Structures are given as structure tokens and as C-alpha cells.
């Protein structure tokens, strides 16, 4: 549940930068990052100085810590309805999802402060900013030396850990939503419906020449926000980061030589490849919601001071560009909402939804900056984040190479009018609602034209991942008259998150509810998948069963 918001009254006097509260890195010359108590103290200081901000909690962690958020806008708003009345883009920026990756947390605190206390016109005149600086608050408090918790990172001296207190990777949890942090963020997404979601991270991998790398939503199912961010926002951000902020940035990825098997073509030995497109990752998930997701990855081999500076600059430029393109972004998100509303009523309007994809095989060829790493011959000497026996040279060169930065569909599905779940699938219905999806319930048995899925094979992963043995199904859809019992759950695709409905409920989806074992007790080779596809939800579509022609659906309340 979204916490109550406290608003600070306007600042009574003009402050100078000398009056501003300082983040933990600023106070320690970037030797240290903020503890949870430091973040709370910093936010309390902003409130005490009457910064024009609103403060709240998105929810609690499993260990009971509040997850603070801050709202900044001019005029100041404190509720989602007030924000929507302004008609501006809402930008949700999150730091510290992986608590060892610290610069997002500290950069976001500093940026909130600087924007709030600025007396000059700035982005807050054109957007609503929601900042969540310490999302993985429990993981943040498990401090240990950087050499233990973040071996490939150049400081600070002590950092938190990647997972939350339940040992869950929060950036693999957006579909199954098992962590309280994830459930809290989904509630914020549903309540505020941000147009843009920015997730702040630090890289783990290759030695390249960029202060920061970025990615849009990579899933081909992100047909609105993913493509718009890739083609219209991120190229502009790249240029502005270079010319305005003196930082070289590039599309997120690693050198193929550092990640064997990243591409199918084993004859390619030098290239650059991005990461996984599935919606378990937050920014990929957000694109399938019909919004814009942007991943930010500071360069782990840079110093903490430089990582904070590059992340600060990147978020600042994102906010500036969103402010400039506010009308276009609001129009895009409105179209993303309206397109699925016709599904089931106008078959010609239905757009195929990608549920499985693969890395492109025809990459772009681009210049990529590499750093030369040398063998030192002395395994006793180490540099932070550098393997023993190797050393950074500070020598960079530009190499022309293939860049694999996007995915193409391998399996599409046409959205039906609705999916129907068995009356006993209450856990699935509850999780769908948590994703902001409307779920109805039939009040009597009925029949309708549709199709059922026959399971030919069940492929279960031998190893656990995030506490699960992931499942993949193979089979076939077969058309026919479907008999549906009373109290069935009905999930129409004609709703703003219609594409997400398809992705989560299709049995062959590469990251749907089937993947995460939500239907395991109902799966049998040769049997029927427990979710049915219905072609027509209208009274005419149900006319095949005259006894139930008067059936209606009622919204399930609990």
C-alpha cells in the first residue's frame, strides 16, 4: 500500500548551496555510500529546510523498513489525481534495486536536492518526478567490503548486497512479484501510472570506454515505449551526454568475448551484445505495460565519484528530454492504452503480440570504445574490480564491430477477446490484479467459441533459479466450443494492459505465469492447459448456449 504523503511548505528563505544537506559520498570524499539511516536523515533534512517536496513510503521491506519516495513538481502535487490533472509526463526514477550498485541512490538524492532548491526554471515546471532512492533497503544494510560484495566494482569501501533480505533478485521479480518490494512498486505503477520508468544500476562486465551504458525496453512486445525510447530518446541523450556533460555513453552490452554463447553465430569473435529481453527485468516489463522503460548502467570500473556524476548527469538529461517531448510522450502512452480497447470488438484492429524472441542475426556495425587490459605477471597486485594478474592501462581505442542491441520475434500470438481461468485459480487472478489488470468473474456457466491448448511436452529446468524450476510448454491450440463453469475468471484483452495480459497468460510465453510455476499443479502431458482463449465476449458470442445467454460477468471484489 502506498504510504501517506507529507508535504513540506514552501522554503521561507533563499538557500545557498552551503546550506544544502550533503549525501554520504559528498561528506566522505566518495569513500563511503549511504546507509539506510543516512538516506532517511538526508530526506529529513530536506523536509526541515522546507524543500518544496512531498514525502512518502511505497511500502515496507520484508524486514519492516519503509521504502521512501519523494515527489517533486511545480506546482507541488501529492496524489496521483493531482498529478494527472497537470497533464504532464510522470517520471519514476528508482535507485538501489541491487544494493551493491550504489551510485543511483546517492546521485538521485543529490539531484532531488538541487532541483528542489533551485530558484530558476527547471524540469519540475514541466514534469512530475517520483524518486525512489533506496528501493532495496534491506540489501543496502548488509554492508561488507567491496572486495566481498562487489568484486568487479571500483569502490566504495563498503557496499550492500545484490538480493533483498529474502535472497531474491528484485530485478528478476517483476513477473512473479514475490518480494514485498516488487508488490509495492507495482502498486505505485498502478496508482501513478508513470509515463517513464528509469532504473539505475552499475555494470558488472567488460572493460569499455563509456561512463554509462543504457537500454530501452528490449522486448519486441514493447511496441510503443521500447521503439520510441530506442529511436527518439536515447540517441539524443547520447549526444547530449557528450556535448553537455562530457560523458561518453553507449547502448548497454558487453563484448562477445566476455560472454561466450551470447550470440548464435559462433564464427563472430568480436562484437557487442546486449542483455535479456524478458519482462522479469523491470525496464523490459515496463515497456510491455505500454510505457517507456530506460535502464541506466554506470561503469563499475570508474571511481565512485565519477559513477555518481555520470548517473546524476544521465538522469538530469532524461528529465530534461522528457520535459521537452512531454506532449509526444503523453500522446504515445494514450495510444498504447487505447489500441487494445478495440480487441475483441474489431478483429481488424488486433495486433500480434510477441511472446518469444531471439537476438537479431543482422546487427548494426558501429564504432565501440575498448580499453586495453594488460597482463601484469604479478597475481599479488590488484586493482579494485580488476582480476588478479591484470591491470588497466588507461589506453582506449575505437574498434568497428557488430552491435547486437535488439531482438526479433520467434513466436507471436493474436490476442483473443479474453482468457478464461478455472474458478480455483484465485492466486493467478490475484497476481493479475497486482499487475494492474482487470479480472472479471462469470456468475453462471456458459459456452463460447474459442480454443484450448493441448500440452505435448513439459520442459522443466533442472536447476533452480530464484527458488523456481522454470517451466516451458510445447503444444497446440485447438478451436471448438468451450464450456466454461460458473465463477470462471475472465480476463479481457480489451484493456490498457492488453499486451501484458497476453504475455503473462500464453502457455508458450518465455516469461509468463507458466514459467514461474503458477499452473504446475494443473499441467499434464496430453492434458489441457488450464487457461482457455475466447474469441467473442458479447452476448452473441455466448449464444451457442441458450440456457446461459443471459449470463453476465461481475467484477471480483476479493
Annotate each predicted stretch with a short phrase.
Residues 1-6:
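Bacterial N-terminal signal peptides
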Amino acid at each position: 500500500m502506498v504510504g501517506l504523503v507529507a508535504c513540506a511548505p514552501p522554503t521561507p528563505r533563499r538557500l545557498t548551496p552551503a546550506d544544502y544537506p550533503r549525501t554520504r559520498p559528498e561528506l566522505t570524499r566518495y569513500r563511503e555510500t549511504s546507509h539506510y539511516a543516512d538516506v532517511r536523515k538526508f530526506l529529513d533534512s530536506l523536509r526541515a529546510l522546507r524543500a518544496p517536496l512531498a514525502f512518502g513510503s511505497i511500502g515496507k521491506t520484508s524486514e519492516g523498513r519503509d521504502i521512501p519516495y519523494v515527489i517533486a513538481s511545480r506546482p507541488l502535487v501529492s496524489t496521483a489525481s493531482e498529478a494527472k490533472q497537470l497533464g504532464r509526463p510522470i517520471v519514476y526514477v528508482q535507485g538501489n534495486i541491487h544494493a551493491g550498485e550504489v551510485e543511483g541512490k546517492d546521485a538521485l538524492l543529490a539531484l532531488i536536492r538541487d532541483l528542489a532548491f533551485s530558484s530558476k526554471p527547471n524540469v519540475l515546471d514541466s514534469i512530475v518526478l517520483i524518486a525512489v532512492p533506496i528501493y532495496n533497503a534491506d540489501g543496502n544494510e548488509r554492508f561488507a567490503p567491496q572486495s566481498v560484495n562487489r568484486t568487479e566494482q571500483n569502490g566504495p569501501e563498503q557496499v550492500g548486497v545484490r538480493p533483498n533480505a529474502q535472497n531474491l533478485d528484485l530485478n528478476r521479480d517483476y513477473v512473479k512479484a514475490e518480494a514485498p518490494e516488487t508488490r509495492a512498486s507495482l502498486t505505485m505503477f498502478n496508482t501513478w501510472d508513470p509515463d517513464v520508468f528509469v532504473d539505475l544500476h552499475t555494470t558488472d562486465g567488460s572493460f569499455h570506454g563509456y561512463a554509462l551504458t543504457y537500454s530501452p525496453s528490449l522486448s519486441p512486445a514493447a511496441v510503443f515505449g521500447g521503439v520510441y525510447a530506442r529511436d527518439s530518446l536515447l540517441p539524443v541523450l547520447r549526444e547530449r551526454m557528450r556535448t553537455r556533460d562530457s560523458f561518453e555513453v553507449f547502448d548497454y552490452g558487453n563484448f562477445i568475448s566476455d560472454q561466450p554463447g551470447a550470440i548464435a553465430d559462433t564464427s563472430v569473435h568480436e562484437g557487442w551484445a546486449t542483455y535479456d529481453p524478458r519482462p522479469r527485468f523491470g525496464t523490459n516489463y515496463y515497456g510491455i505495460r505500454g510505457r517507456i522503460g530506460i535502464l541506466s548502467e554506470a561503469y563499475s570500473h570508474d571511481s565512485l565519484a565519477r559513477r555518481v556524476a555520470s548517473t546524476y548527469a544521465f538522469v538530469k538529461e532524461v528529465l530534461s528530454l522528457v520535459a521537452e517531448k512531454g506532449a509526444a510522450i503523453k500522446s504515445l502512452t494514450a495510444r498504447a492504452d487505447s489500441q487494445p480497447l478495440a480487441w475483441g470488438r474489431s478483429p481488424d484492429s488486433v495486433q500480434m503480440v510477441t511472446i518469444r524472441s531471439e537476438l537479431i542475426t543482422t546487427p548494426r556495425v558501429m564504432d565501440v570504445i575498448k580499453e586495453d587490459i594488460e597482463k601484469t605477471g604479478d597475481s599479488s597486485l590488484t586493482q579494485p574490480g580488476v582480476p588478479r594478474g591484470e591491470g588497466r592501462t588507461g589506453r582506449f581505442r575505437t574498434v568497428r564491430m557488430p552491435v547486437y542491441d535488439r531482438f526479433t520475434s520467434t513466436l507471436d500470438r493474436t490476442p483473443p477477446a479474453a482468457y478464461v481461468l478455472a474458478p480455483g485459480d484465485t492466486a493467478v487472478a490475484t497476481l493479475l490484479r497486482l499487475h494492474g489488470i482487470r479480472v472479471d468473474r462469470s456468475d453462471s456457466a456458459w459456452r463460447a467459441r474459442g480454443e484450448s491448448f493441448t500440452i505435448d511436452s513439459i520442459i522443466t529446468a533442472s536447476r533452480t533459479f530464484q527458488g523456481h524450476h522454470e517451466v516451458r510448454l510445447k503444444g497446440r491450440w485447438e478451436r471448438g466450443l468451450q464450456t466454461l463453469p460458473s465463477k470462471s475468471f475472465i480476463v479481457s484483452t480489451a484493456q490498457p494492459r492488453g499486451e501484458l495480459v497476453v504475455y503473462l497468460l500464453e502457455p508458450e510465453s518465455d516469461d509468463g505465469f507458466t514459467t514461474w510455476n503458477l499452473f504446475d499443479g494443473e499441467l499434464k502431458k496430453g492434458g489441457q492447459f488450464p487457461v482457455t482463449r475466447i474469441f467473442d465476449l458479447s452476448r452473441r458470442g455466448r449464444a451457442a448456449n441458450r440456457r446461459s445467454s443471459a449470463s453476465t460477468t461481475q467484477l471480483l471484489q476479493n
